[in-house]
Amino acid sequence: MSWQEKINAALDARRAADALRRRYPVAQGAGRWLVADDRQYLNFSSNDYLGLSHHPQIIRAWKQGAEQFGIGSGGSGHVSGYSVVHQALEEELAEWLGYSRALLFISGFAANQAVIAAMMAKEDRIVADRLSHASLLEAASLSPSQLRRFTHNDVAHLARLLASPCPGQQLVVTEGVFSMDGDSAPLAEIQQVTQQHNGWLMVDDAHGTGVIGEQGRGSCWLQKVKPELLVVTFGKGFGVSGAAVLCSSTVADYLLQFARHLIYSTSMPPAQAQALRASLAVIRRDEGDARREKLVSLIARFRAGVQDLPFTLADSCSAIQPLIVGDNSRALQLAEKLRQQGCWVTAIRPPTVPAGTARLRLTLTAAHEMQDIDRLLEVLHGNG
């Protein structure tokens, strides 16, 4: 089989399964509204959970940062790309979340890959929730360590896997809020079992940070858990992009030496770090509380109105509200019907989710209004 035949076969298989991914160029897509092909849609596919991507204070901070520092960082943080504003953001994140140190990364994917690649050796073991994000599972699969997966949120299964002999160290990996189901991990129970077996815990709280807990401190703070490694991202609750790893001073020093994604990547623009500082300020103050409270009300309105639809509603109290349809083709058709009626919704299919669980991944944001939720419910009931 030639290279082209190999590529064609893979694409043909995706097409046959109604699983071929496509991108749609949009003129506007992060907030309440999405604009595509000169048409405006109510946007129920954005991860901008607090509606901060268009916040004037954050936009102004980015502009001021660009005027002061330029539009790029100019290099890796180990060379010349680590500015005083990067340092200030790291210090503010560490203080906010109760850690000694924070290290900035260009994306959550890069942060997860960097930590696992740097920390794990051949004699070690990763025990990961089966539904962990692709960045975590791919990094675990590529690492020299042994990978074992436990049934989703099944602490008893996790305990059995941890109890089997391991010549090295054990790292338990999970998410705070799961990206495709919207449910939360039982972090306190997971941490207890992990500590009983002398392991470390790594939590990716991409979808909880900024959105839940006191001052938006996320899933771990809400459940009174402090993992050894906490990954937070800035493309969801913060409304920007990028990520950070929260850890001890010693672990931070170690990652600065051995995390290749950190060492060999151009750091985020200082202007972006300036915008993230402004976003963090909004998240922590009363305005952040008001946005979180509004989001909770919108979620409650949606869940109350969707109960009698002929779809499986995930057990989620988060901004992620999946309607599990099952069949790939049916999920695509339903998403298209909703778009025709002015609601932009994305169909998520395998391999992103398990086979037979194709779904509409609906996301609500504080930028929405109650009438937006009512319109979504009206359209769903008309196509249920």
UniProtKB/Swiss-Prot annotation:
Biological process, per Gene Ontology: biotin biosynthetic process
Tagged with keyword Transferase: yes
Cofactor field: pyridoxal 5'-phosphate
Enzyme class: transferase
Function comment: Catalyzes the decarboxylative condensation of pimeloyl-[acyl-carrier protein] and L-alanine to produce 8-amino-7-oxononanoate (AON), [acyl-carrier protein], and carbon dioxide.
Alphabetized SUPFAM superfamilies for the sequence: PLP-dependent transferases
Assembly notes: Homodimer.
Record-linked InterPro entries: Aminotrans_II_pyridoxalP_BS (IPR001917), Aminotransferase_I/II_large (IPR004839), AON_synthase_class-II (IPR050087), AONS_Archaea/Proteobacteria (IPR004723), AONS_Proteobacteria (IPR022834), PyrdxlP-dep_Trfase (IPR015424), PyrdxlP-dep_Trfase_major (IPR015421), PyrdxlP-dep_Trfase_small (IPR015422)
Organism: Shigella flexneri
Record-given protein name: 8-amino-7-oxononanoate synthase
PROSITE patterns found in the cross-reference section: AA_TRANSFER_CLASS_2
Pathway membership: Cofactor biosynthesis; biotin biosynthesis
Entry superkingdom: Bacteria
Keywords: Biotin biosynthesis, Pyridoxal phosphate, Transferase
Binding, pyridoxal 5'-phosphate: 108-109, 179, 207, 233
Family listed: Belongs to the class-II pyridoxal-phosphate-dependent aminotransferase family. BioF subfamily.
Residues holding substrate: 21, 133, 352
Gene: bioF
One Gene Ontology MF term: 8-amino-7-oxononanoate synthase activity
Catalytic activity: 6-carboxyhexanoyl-[ACP] + L-alanine + H(+) = (8S)-8-amino-7-oxononanoate + holo-[ACP] + CO2
Pfam families the UniProt entry points to: Aminotran_1_2 (PF00155)
